[in-house]
Amino acid sequence: MLRRLSCLVILLSSMVMLPAAQSRGSAPAFDSAKAYEHLRQMVLIGPRPAGSAALHSTRAYITKQMAAAGLTVQEMPFTVQTPIGSVNMVNLVVRLPGRRTDRILITGHYDTKLFRDFTFVGASDGASSAAMLMELARVLKGQPHEFTYEFVWFDGEEAFCRDWDECKNPDGPDNTYGSRYYVSAARKANALSSIKAMILLDMVGARNLKLRKDGEFAAAWLNDIVWATAKKMNHGSTFIDLPGDVGGDDHEPFSKAGIPTIDLIDLHDYPEWHTKDDDLNHVAAGSLQIVGDVLIASLPEIEKRLMTQR
């Protein structure tokens, strides 16, 4: 345990001691075909609940694909007590150094919810966010940026009990295990202050994608930048100007720690959520393209805002 904690402190400390990014040539564009293929490959693995062999295979796939893009994945292992017992989990981290060591986290979860009575492959809820992070990391690797970008694939976002709050207890909810662990570990390593913003992608693959503004835990200025960017890019029909509060997602622990967050999630308009129909028939590469393009275009504005804050 002491050795694991020592390694974790080194990992988190290294996140705030990074060399400046080098200028690069022409950067690649976001390719939704690549992102969709990552999504498809993860769906083919099957259900991927935390602690399963299938999720281990998913980690191996992500690590291999990131290595092919010239990026190194670092593992953040931890063990938690859940309603089904002790479960070993692993967050995955890829860092793209910027001119500053202060970080913008770009995150999502890569596990799927445990269902015992039907096959749940989580095409949008799990695979879409994990696939988006892989393609975004590949693309942003080739673009100079002021802040360090840190991509985090969270384990254990999904609840083990059938209903989301069925097994909630005073010590914590039955969900968001990976993000809560990350925040706790960063706090212990005195690394929280270097996180200037946290962007969460969750359920962004639906064919008829509708993203609403979370007003419960998201920072209004982050919502404003992303939605204004989407409008300029003629994607107002996807980034709709309606409220859609989202609690119990991976941005919540960061928001409670005082970090500005945003959650891009199609929760209120995706009837396939947590059903057997969250499959390849209900997701589309075009939705991934819209989110990827808007997010990449929003990042310079987010950085500009952060540089003017005192």
Each predicted region: which residue ranges?
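Stable alpha-helical elements in mature extracytoplasmic
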Residues: 31-41, 54, 58, 62-65, ...
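Acidic/histidine-rich catalytic neighborhood of metal-dependent amide-processing enzymes
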Residues: 117-225, 246
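Active-site-proximal beta-strand/loop segments in catalytic clefts of secreted hydrolases
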Residues: 42, 76-78, 96-98, 107-111, ...
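Second-shell loop/turn segments in exported
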Residues: 24-29, 43-56, 80-83, 116-127, ...
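A non-catalytic alpha/beta surface segment that caps or lines the substrate-entry region
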Residues: 26, 37-99
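Sec/Tat-exported extracytoplasmic proteins
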Residues: 39, 43-50, 66-73, 96, ...
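Active-site-adjacent substrate-binding region
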Residues: 79, 197, 204-310
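Bacterial N-terminal signal peptides
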Residues: 6-17
